[in-house]
Amino acid sequence: MMPLSRSRLEFIATILQNVLNLGLLTLGLILVVFLGKETVHLADALFVPEQASKYELVEGLVIYFLYFEFIALIVKYFKSGLHFPLRYFVYIGITAIVRLIIVDHKTPMDVLLYSAAILLLVITLWLCNSNRLRRE
């Protein structure tokens, strides 16, 4: 089998990069639609006087922030020269674990473990933003 030339490899990489960009653009548009639906859901939950709707409202707010963070991650990808900054994934992880604590707080041990995971992610975020590892 003949090895591929450098120009062919670059062509393949360009095609795959364009497919990735199109997929992320499509995902971003889908997330914007879900963000709009979540806005309507939050407006409905806001005006329901029941106690259960307050939990639904808080859960909806955290989900709203998750959609928002994923959209911000996609925007940052295109603005930073097709690169995903690590700290955005850490932000999304922290928000997802906070949502898990709010929604599923059955045992104190689970909450403690989730809190330890958040602490670990915050330490990771601090390390990523330190001068030694700072890229931007």
Curated annotation (Swiss-Prot):
Q: Please provide an example of a Pfam family that matches this protein in its UniProt record.
A: PsiE
In the bilayer, the protein is annotated as:
Multi-pass membrane protein
Its primary localisation, in coarse terms, equals membrane
User: Keywords in UniProt for this one?
Assistant: Cell inner membrane, Cell membrane, Membrane, Transmembrane, Transmembrane helix
What's any GO biological process attached to this entry? cellular response to phosphate starvation
**Which HAMAP family does the entry mention?**
PsiE
Q: Which family does it belong to?
A: Belongs to the PsiE family.
Q: What is this protein called?
A: Protein PsiE
Transmembrane annotation, as ranges: 15-35, 55-75, 83-103, 108-128
- In terms of domain of life, where is this protein from? Bacteria
State the organism of origin: Salmonella schwarzengrund (strain CVM19633)
**What InterPro entries does the entry give?**
P_starv_induced_PsiE (IPR009315), P_starv_induced_PsiE-like (IPR020948)
Question: Encoded by which gene?
Answer: psiE
